[in-house]
Amino acid sequence: MGPPPPPPPPPLLPSGEILPSRKWKTEDAPRRNNHPAPAPPKPSRPTVDASALQHAAARLRKTGYNEPVRGDVENLSDGRLDRPHQQLPDGDRTYRANLQQLAQPKTRAEIPSPPTYSNQPRPLGDFHRDPNALSQFQQSREALLSSTSPTSNYSPINKFSSSTLTQYANKSPSPPSFGNSNSEATYVSPYSSKHSYPTNFRSYHKDDDYFNNTATTATTTTSSNSLNENNNSNKYGNKETVLQWSEPYDPSKIRRSQSPIRNAREMIHEYSTTNYVTEVQQPPPPPPDLYQRMTQARTFLQNSLAKQLRDEGLTESQKAANRNQTGALSASSSIPFDASQIVKNSYNGDEVDHLVHQMRTKLNQPADTSPSIVQYPRRQAPDSSRANYSATTSTSFSSSTTRKIMNINICVGCGKEITGDQPGCNAMNQIFHVDCFKCGQCSKTLAGASFYNIDDKPTCEGCYQNSLEKCTACNRAISDKLLRACGGVYHVNCFVCFSCKKSLDGIPFTLDKDNNVHCVPCFHDKFAPRCALCSKPIVPQDGEKESVRVVAMDKSFHVDCYKCEDCGMQLSSKLEGQGCYPIDNHLLCKTCNGNRLRVVSST
């Protein structure tokens, strides 16, 4: 089976039929004001011919790498017709009669060609420029940029030859040449006159390092009755403009530059498995007198700076005198005093060692006991009579003194060295002999036993308990938290209320006449005055320190309880008419008092 037929062409209108325009109306068209517009015809659903889909699917194919497209291959059928006169199947087409009418052969009228050179177009030039001015500019440019190098047939596109520009600027129209020609022809574009492109051109990138280019340039000859190899001739009237190329375009013949890496896998493997060792050249040794020259240069700079500072405010005569003066002592003369002896004496340190040792002794020994170590005499300054004092003797004496004082194996108690016969122990960040580490009160040996540090003095447990304060209530030693109150010392659990036995730690309390401790509620309940009316104690209100009471008829009353017994009016001596008028120890107001008197008098 051949390829599917192409899709049908658009339908043709019958001869003489004209579609009405939107801008004018036909005579048969109804008026808009009188009659409504006719309903538009029902649109038919567009259909797609199956043969057209098959034809479109058959043209779809995948192009391989470096494969030319269909348009680049000559005489290649587009897939529509296998033979020149193959008829398309009509099928059920709507315009079958019209297609058959168009398919009929018709006679064609030949148009005679015009005479030769009758209508020859001129090459387009720059309409806004004078060709003569361009020619003069090119001539002056050639004079400045003259070169003796031979003209190359291969020139890049963007590099124009001045001779070519001048040639085409002054070129007059001439008939096309027939036959062989050895001169280079340049294509002049009919759309642009500002640039001319050389006929034979190549890419500006040349890979001459990887392959040898042996291609030669061949000028293609053309004739008026035949086409060139690329079929790239275009006719404008009777003039034929030929697009000449160095060789026919064939994508399969394109030379590609070879990669300098022949095998990438081998290069990667070699780089990853080979250790490249580079020989490091040792720098040449410095000259032997380099250090001496650097020292001399540094000394010269220092001396120059010192002399510059010295001579800054002097006159010329003073500067000359300074340059010519010599030192009072020559370099060979000896110093009048012994410098080494001064250095040795400065490192003896007898005075400092004596002060450090004395300070340690005073800190470690009690104040009432004298230190048991030997006091080293202070070193006196050497005078003229002791100038010949032996340096060896001073050094040995100083070293022995320093060893005794700075030795860490010295007992703090007795000041003697700890040896194997007299072992020591470490306590309170100090070192003691075992026999010297005793209790400060009972002289009990404390080595290997528990002790208490009281004012930097070791104390045994018995002496420590005896030194503690005793509770006033239970007469026992207080080893933990204690309370001091009322001139005594108490345990927390021993300082309690005398009535309710509640601990008074952090609670207000008071004393009675027998110095018994009571809490405030128990004290008021036990010793506060009672109200004569309600028989309750009169205590201070919340937040108050003192209680308020009313005393009448040698009795105490609450403020709220001091009122008339008959009418219940609050009695107060500050308000007129509200005073208390008692009868037989009864609280009565003035009115109730008169009423009771009238009743008694009536009876």
Swiss-Prot record:
GO terms for cellular component: actin cytoskeleton; axon; focal adhesion; M band; nucleus; stress fiber; striated muscle dense body. Residues 184-193, 315-333, 363-373, 382-391 have a biased composition (Polar residues). Keywords: Cell adhesion, Cell junction, Cell projection, Cytoplasm, Cytoskeleton, LIM domain, Metal-binding, Neurogenesis, Nucleus, Repeat, Zinc. Expressed in neurons and body wall muscle. Expressed in pharyngeal, enteric and uterine muscles and in spermatheca. Its main location: nucleus. Residues 409-470, 471-529, 530-601 form the LIM zinc-binding domain. Disulfide bonds: none annotated. Disruption phenotype: RNAi-mediated knock-down of isoform a in a dys-1/hlh-1 double mutant background reduces muscle degeneration. GO terms for biological process: cell-cell adhesion; maintenance of synapse structure; nervous system development; smooth muscle contraction. The keyword ATP-binding does not apply. It is found in: Nucleus; Cytoplasm; Cytoplasm, Myofibril, Sarcomere, M line; Cell projection, Axon. Residues 69-95 have a biased composition (Basic and acidic residues). Residues 1-131, 166-193, 218-237, 310-333, 363-395 are annotated as: Disordered. Pfam families: LIM. Interacts with dyc-1. Interacts with glh-1 and glh-3. Functions both as a mechanical stabilizer (via LIM domains) of focal adhesions, and as a sensor component for muscle cell damage (via N-terminus). Regulates, stabilizes and maintains posterior lateral mechanosensory (PLM) synaptic branch extension and new synapse formation and growth during larval development. Belongs to the zyxin/ajuba family. The LIM domains are sufficient for the role in PLM synaptogenesis. This is Zyxin. It comes from Caenorhabditis elegans.
